[in-house]
Amino acid sequence: MDASENGATAPEKHDDGESFTKVKSKKSQKRKLEPDGGITMEVEQPNKRPHFPPISADKLRGPDEMRKVAVPAHRYTPLKENWLKIFTPIVENLQLQVRFNLKTRNVEIKTCKETQDIAALTKAADFIKAFVLGFQVDDAMALIRLDELFLESFDVTDVKPLKGDHLSRAIGRIAGKGGKTKFTIENVTKTRIVLADTKIHILGSFQNIKMARTAICNLILGSPPSKVYGNIRAVASRTAERF
């Protein structure tokens, strides 16, 4: 039986080879890189971290800042007598401007172009404040030289609400005969203490202020000085061994 009789026709053959076209898949195009410049992949360059150089003190400094420290009447004479010792470290070491305003009775401290340290204004204000509270100039000057020193103030009545003779006896226990108790606490705890009526001011490091405050509070609450001496010496020896 012939194929023509069944009505079926055979497919025609083309010899030119264009009957089938090979199509490349997109995946193979992405994976294969042709060196002759046919297909190329763009690789994103990693972003470089921004570089910010340190800013100098002149650019960082904004408008001039000022601090004012009020001086009570009973500290006018000591301030006048020690004025040379007070303004010399503020001007030479901290590069600040300082003056005493006679109208407002304030010590005014101001920054200027020569000021390098940002914290200089705070150090100078703490130095003046310590002197106004009653500390000696040499003791208060440690606030300028050292960064880890602080001032703490509290009232005797904050520890125990005492009145009249009871309050006077509590202050006397803190001071001791001829100031012996106060000097002992200062030497053991390496702090400086000022008793101003019912106010107590302590100058020292954080840990030493804590030791001195605990000893003074125990004296206010009625503990005998001998027991307080033993306690602070034990705490001081333990702290020295730890550090």
Curated annotation (Swiss-Prot):
The keyword Nucleus applies. One of its GO terms (biological process) is ribosome biogenesis. GO terms for molecular function: RNA binding. Residues 11-21 have a biased composition (Basic and acidic residues). It comes from the Eukaryota. Residues 164-216 form the KH domain. GO terms for cellular component: nucleolus; nucleus. It is found in: Nucleus, Nucleolus. Keywords: Nucleus, RNA-binding. The keyword Nucleus applies. It holds the Pfam family KH_PNO1_2nd. Residues 1-60 are annotated as: Disordered. Positively regulates dimethylation of two adjacent adenosines in the loop of a conserved hairpin near the 3'-end of 18S rRNA. Belongs to the PNO1 family. This is RNA-binding protein PNO1. It comes from Oryzias latipes. The lineage of its organism: Eukaryota, Metazoa, Chordata, Craniata, Vertebrata.
